[in-house]
Curated annotation (Swiss-Prot):
Alphabetically ordered keywords of this record: ATP-binding, Kinase, Magnesium, Metal-binding, Nucleotide-binding, Thiamine biosynthesis, Transferase
Gene Ontology MF: a single term: magnesium ion binding
Catalytic class of the enzyme: transferase
Pathway noted in the entry: Cofactor biosynthesis; thiamine diphosphate biosynthesis; 4-methyl-5-(2-phosphoethyl)-thiazole from 5-(2-hydroxyethyl)-4-methylthiazole: step 1/1
Cysteine pairings via disulfide bonds: none
Protein name from the UniProt record: Hydroxyethylthiazole kinase
Organism name: Methanoregula boonei (strain DSM 21154 / JCM 14090 / 6A8)
Binding site for substrate: M45, G194
Stretch forming the signal peptide: none
Described function: Catalyzes the phosphorylation of the hydroxyl group of 4-methyl-5-beta-hydroxyethylthiazole (THZ).
Amino acid sequence: MDNQVFSGIFARAREQHPLVHHITNYVTVNDCANITIGAGGAPVMADAREEAGEMTGFAGALVLNIGTLNSGIIESMILAGKVANERKIPIILDPVGAGATRLRTDSTRRLLDELTISIIKGNAGEIGVLAGAEAKVRGVDSAGISGDPVTITRTFARETGITVVMSGATDIISDGNKVLLVDNGHPLMGRISGTGCMASAVTGVIAAVEKDRLIAAATALAAFGLAGERAAAASRGPGSFKPALFDAMAELGPQDLAADARVRSA
């Protein structure tokens, strides 16, 4: 892939400062807001049923994250998602813990059934379960998947018409036809809570300015992974890594993606 493509998209996000509406979890809500700002966007978190749809109408993207779900939150997600679909606003779904409990799995399937999702991003266990593969989820973390991850990701994308991201040491992205692999990132990103949620937030920023969902997801994950690499170089461990990650994301420029994004075709 030509890194100038990712660089140009990231520059647009920095210039346009898109509003991204998050209905997310209370574990990482502040992290998602701050990483959205760092990536060039403007965050808003409105999960009340009385305003979720109205707020979505102002946004460039909608991010739905089921990390701490309940029945009221799911209804707000449906209301917001329907407005997004009516106005052709992209929806990014992060099915945190899908496969771990019946509530999480059923709620994710309901969102997939009732809404047109643009991008779904999950770990190997979450995507594997939703794709019908043999996979395990322990809490909100992947506990393994049986089968070829690239094939599972591509097939799930083809069957649903959704751009699918299976996150991992190498992120796998497919629109059902093409498959892109993103190698940016650092092991410290897996040693703090919330980096998966933050990756979805950054994806919302980029999807708000780029209609090609495959390229948008690759741009977002390369940028976030690159920020993780730079934060790790300035850190002593998980405690110092987290604030360094926000600094690195805020300091990242289009020229950094042009030089250091590592995205390849499968």
